[in-house]
């Protein structure tokens, strides 16, 4: 009721004539015009002009997986009307990284069950968050199965209590955080590199669409050449690609600068670019650290339970 009163006060009216404007999603215009045709009113529909774009409200429409990221996107800010919807790109990485950090079948099943029960209530205000928990629960179960973790080593500990002579020591696994730490670290940084390059690809395409071709070449394409050069050098193919990439960094960093600023721009681009990339990729090592920490904490928590039972049994 309060909202209706507020909307009424905002209408343009002189007591006899009422005029107002608003926005409607394009796919709903047919439904709107069908309703307005039944009313005693005149109306016009038009696409937003370039000047109006900053004022156009944003309605995100994604699939079930990407829609789950709405609760995170809305905490920061919605993209501009002519911008890029981050949800389809962010969702796979976010859900994948979450599952990688948790990596436990038991925790994942709890997340799946809790979110499923909540979604059965169909509360639209909280639905996005619970959908995110659901999909994160899926990847948590998957990574838990890959690492053989069910509430840590709870099952082997439980079986050991029931049958001290059992040979069951662990669930089958592809890798474990304690034994394959370096492999997980390399995998985490590789996934981080893929995410960063994906972001660069989106930036590259958007700059091309806006006609900022030189910016797209010097700020994104240049570093792709550098990365390709590093890969070629590591494989022992050739060093020429890397030299070309570094030359492009030097040329691109100073192409818009003037005078002595070209020199400082070159050194700044090389130093900030290389150290920045190294730091960004290295930061994904936290995925491995959190997976390892969760595994260790679970084992520490489960061990006293088994030890207490063993002492009681001996007594």
Task: Please tell me what each predicted stretch does.
Residues 1-90, 118, 123-133:
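Long, charged N-terminal accessory/stalk domains
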Residues 25, 46, 103, 112, ...:
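Generic beta-strand/beta-sheet core signal
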Residues 67-166, 172-202:
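Core alpha-helical transmembrane segments of integral membrane proteins
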Residues 143, 149-150, 155-307:
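Hard-cation-handling environments
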């Amino acid at each position: 009721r309060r909202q209706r009163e507020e909307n009424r006060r905002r209408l343009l009216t002189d007591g006899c004539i009422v005029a107002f404007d608003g926005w409607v999603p394009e796919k709903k215009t047919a439904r709107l015009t069908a309703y307005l045709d039944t009313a005693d009113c005149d109306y016009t529909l038009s696409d937003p002009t370039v000047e109006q774009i900053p004022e156009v409200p944003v309605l995100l429409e994604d699939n079930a997986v990407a829609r789950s990221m709405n609760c995170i996107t809305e905490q920061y800010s919605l993209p501009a009307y002519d911008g890029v919807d981050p949800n389809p790109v962010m969702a796979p990485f976010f859900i994948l990284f979450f599952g990688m950090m948790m990596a436990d079948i038991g925790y994942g099943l709890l997340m799946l069950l809790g979110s499923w029960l909540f979604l059965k209530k169909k509360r639209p205000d909280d639905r996005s968050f619970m959908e995110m928990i659901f999909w994160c629960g899926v990847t948590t179960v998957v990574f838990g199965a890959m690492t053989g973790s069910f509430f840590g080593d709870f099952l082997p500990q439980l079986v050991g209590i029931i049958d001290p002579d059992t040979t069951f020591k662990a669930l089958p696994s592809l890798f474990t955080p304690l034994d394959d730490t370096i492999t997980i670290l390399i995998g985490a940084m590789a996934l981080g590199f893929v995410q960063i390059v994906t972001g660069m690809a989106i930036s590259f395409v958007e700059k091309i669409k806006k006609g900022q071709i030189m910016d797209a070449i010097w700020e994104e394409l240049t570093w792709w050449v550098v990365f390709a050069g590093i890969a070629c050098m590591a494989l022992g193919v050739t060093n020429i690609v890397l030299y070309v990439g570094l030359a492009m960094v030097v040329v691109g960093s100073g192409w818009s600068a003037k005078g002595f600023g070209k020199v400082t721009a070159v050194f700044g681009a090389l130093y900030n670019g290389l150290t920045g990339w190294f730091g960004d990729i290295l930061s994904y090592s936290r995925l491995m650290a959190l997976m390892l920490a969760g595994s260790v904490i679970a084992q520490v928590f489960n061990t006293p339970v088994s030890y207490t039972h063993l002492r009681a049994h001996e007594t």
